[in-house]
Amino acid sequence: MQTSHYAAEKDMQDAVPRLTFTLRDEERLMMKIGVFVPIGNNGWLISTHAPQYMPTFELNKAIVQKAEHYHFDFALSMIKLRGFGGKTEFWDHNLESFTLMAGLAAVTSRIQIYATAATLTLPPAIVARMAATIDSISGGRFGVNLVTGWQKPEYEQMGIWPGDDYFSRRYDYLTEYVQVLRDLWGSGKSDFKGDFFTMNDCRVSPQPSVPMKVICAGQSDAGMAFSAQYADFNFCFGKGVNTPTAFAPTAARMKQAAEQTGRDVGSYVLFMVIADETDDAARAKWEHYKAGADEEALSWLTEQSQKDTRSGTDTNVRQMADPTSAVNINMGTLVGSYASVARMLDEVASVPGAEGVLLTFDDFLSGIETFGERIQPLMQCRAHLPALTQEVA
């Protein structure tokens, strides 16, 4: 089975056209790079053969400081309140997003910092105040990722799951949520009245020093409509292995949704990088990780993905649970030599609407270093970066 997957993946890679950029293209293709920090144990590989580690502040500090050194543009942490179990206890051990990113804001100076709000757990007025605080810590480098929540057991364990009708109304809920945030970040006062929230002369001060960026990760039609109206950019999954432009239809849908609102909302695409000196060496790593897939944890993911029967078939969780490459929750995966990965990332940048990528690595510390030293210098879409001037531990 692995051999046939390999052949199919290679065929897909060979089918991707090699791009030759003009100067005009290079000016357009200045792509942002971010790191999706491992706030949960073992990062994004659900495998007994992958590096096994616990999330700590010190680990994430080292990762984000190294990313800042190599001119990454932003760092994002997710929020996860219950894991998948299995032999690897995948994501059973997690830090909290806002407090982690507040700490990271204090030990960095340039990189943009994003925390994720699980909006069912936090009233918008509290998120508004926490965000304003981290804005102060970071000197205006903070933004908020808003998620509606899809894994029912995360919220049932606390007695706050609103019922399965929420699946079909979650973006109505989020729309009210962000309107309250906008009031409080803008004027410091909200009297919003809606189906989900009632504000009575609610106050938050001080306000953020700069306009607060809001991001989202909707791939359903409802999610994209929300992002088109309220988000500064929208995350989406890359697709396949070594098929760097396969997400293009998703980016096109986001562009079309944004055109309806008259706003510019680009796509930032999630990829895992597995790189080595040669294509064969990188491929051997990938096959090794797949061979150790934690089937018990993966079955939990599949079970949870089937609970939402009301949001349609185009949601993020549907892609995460696809058996094709569930070992890394089916994010786009770039496997190859440093030169091959650089070329594929330039191809990502060529897709209309793709303004950035959010990267994970099989091994974060060594992965970011090899990316900064060996991959990024080969990328035409990062040719605008200044030279490195200092060492980082």
Curated annotation (Swiss-Prot):
Alphabetized UniProt keyword annotations: Flavoprotein, FMN, Monooxygenase, NADP, Oxidoreductase
InterPro entries for the chain: Luciferase-like_dom, Luciferase-like_sf, Pyrimidine_monooxygenase_RutA, SsuD_RutA_monooxygenase
NCBIfam families per record: RutA
Domain of life: Bacteria
Residues noted as binding FMN in the record, renumbered to the chain: 79-80, 145, 154, 170-171, 220
One record GO biological process: uracil catabolic process
Protein name stated in the entry: Pyrimidine monooxygenase RutA
Induction details: Up-regulated by the nitrogen regulatory protein C (NtrC also called GlnG) and repressed by RutR.
Source species: Escherichia coli O139:H28 (strain E24377A / ETEC)
Class of this enzyme: oxidoreductase
Keyword Flavoprotein annotated: yes
GO molecular function: alkanesulfonate monooxygenase activity; uracil oxygenase activity
Catalysis: reaction(s): uracil + FMNH2 + NADH + O2 = (Z)-3-ureidoacrylate + FMN + NAD(+) + H2O + H(+); thymine + FMNH2 + NADH + O2 = (Z)-2-methylureidoacrylate + FMN + NAD(+) + H2O + H(+)
Chain's role: The FMN-N(5)-oxide reacts spontaneously with NADH to produce FMN. Requires the flavin reductase RutF to regenerate FMN in vivo.
Keyword NADP belongs to the record: yes
Pfam families reported for this sequence: Bac_luciferase
CDD domains linked: Alkanesulfonate_monoxygenase (cd01094)
Similarity comment: family membership: Belongs to the NtaA/SnaA/DszA monooxygenase family. RutA subfamily.
Enzyme Commission number(s) from the entry: 1.14.99.46
S-S bonds: none
